[in-house]
Amino acid sequence: MSEYNMEEIFMEKKLLKRSLTFAMMIAVVFSTIIASSFIKANAAETEKAVTLIQGEKTSQYDTVQEAVAAVSADKTQAVITLNKDFEGAGAVVKKDQNIVFNLNGFTWTINSLVGSSGTETNGVQLLQGSTVTIENGTLTSKTASKLIQNYCDLTIRNATLSGQDNLTEIIVSNNNGSTVITGNSTVQAAAGGIAFDSDKWGGYQGGNVTLEDGQVIGNVNATNGGKISLNGGTVTGDVIASNYTYQGNEKTPANIVIDGATINGNVTAQNVGNISISSGTVTGLVSSESASPVAVTGGVFHTALGENVDISAAEYVASIESNGQAKTVVGKTDFDAAVQSLKSGETINIQVVPENSILTIPEGVTVTNKTNNSIVVNGNALNAGENIIIQPEQPEPTPTPEPEPTPDPEPTPNPEDNNNMTESNNNEQSGSLTSPQTGNDSYSILYISLAFASAALLTMVSFTIRKMSKSK
């Protein structure tokens, strides 16, 4: 066998060995992936729905209800975490239990209800004296009349709560303790239902509810001594403070404070309800059917203020007309913001400002003084009842330059002086003929030097090319 054939056989064996090694590596990788997937799938099948962490102890349960029952009633915080979507019974949190329901991005769907004996209509019941947080996921039910019946201190953070149309009356009903809704949460009522309420019922003190952030879709009601603060977020629905009668009911006013929220709906005080608005935005009608007017000291209102609304405590009030739409701004903060955003063609009707106020209004805006005082607008006095259209500022006139003084005529030269001057000039000109032109000569020398350098460089390049050609 020739040396060439031996080398060829050796290379083939080497290639075959490498191929087998590569195939074994691929097999190991795929086996590892398959085994890992099997282990994960098996773990997912065996993993229980809920994990409870209480102190240093971690336990798993099949249902949320079992995990809640295992939490100690000693005010020590426990965390119940969903490991997957869970559908099952609701839960009752008892006095002195402190539980964080971490929904962990999953959904807890309640299909079996809890509550007082004979009235099991709640998805979750939070008893007086407990502390509860619901966060990071979705809580819903298609069977609950009240998704959450709350008598405790409750925090809803970054959670979505919803019910069933034509069945769920209230998503979060608050009769005691305090409730805070924050962290981009969503509370969505069933169609025509109540998103949350606050009501002093029976022997309870009334749940104090605060909306800090998030979306509320549905009505918001405070009744019979309930207290609600809408400090942020958006409510798409009506806001109502009222009372209803039942045996032994005290005529205690309900109270709602709007301080920063946006209300896409009507705001109404009824019976002996109290409502105050210090900032925020309302797109619907603000009115009072109560003995007490709605007190407004700030805010932006896209519908004309209705009956029994008191703005007497506000230092700044104006209405703004734009493209057939009108809004009312109340309070210095909202007044200043509205003035700064005025555009040409709009009208501002100033209703209340301090006397002799000095205002700066953009050009093209019509200003009407509907106060009883004089004001100053862009430096012009505007008396009560007057109006003005702000004109563009006129540029300052260009000052006329002063004429330059005429120089005195030069004296007539003496002929003898001219002769002497001519001789002097001739002598200077004859002398200048022998003066060297240093500037021009310098440039000439530079050009000649560059030419010689270029020629030398071309010669060297040509010589090098010829030498390389000969060497080949």
Regions found by a protein language model. Give the residues of each.
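Sec-dependent signal peptide cleavage junction
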Residues: 32-48, 433-445, 464-469
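N-terminal extracellular ligand-recognition/capping segment immediately after the signal peptide
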Residues: 77-99, 103-112, 348-375
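Leucine-rich solenoid repeat scaffolds
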Residues: 271-324, 361-392
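C-terminal low-complexity, Ser/Thr- and acidic/Pro-rich disordered "stalk" regions positioned immediately N-terminal
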Residues: 385-441
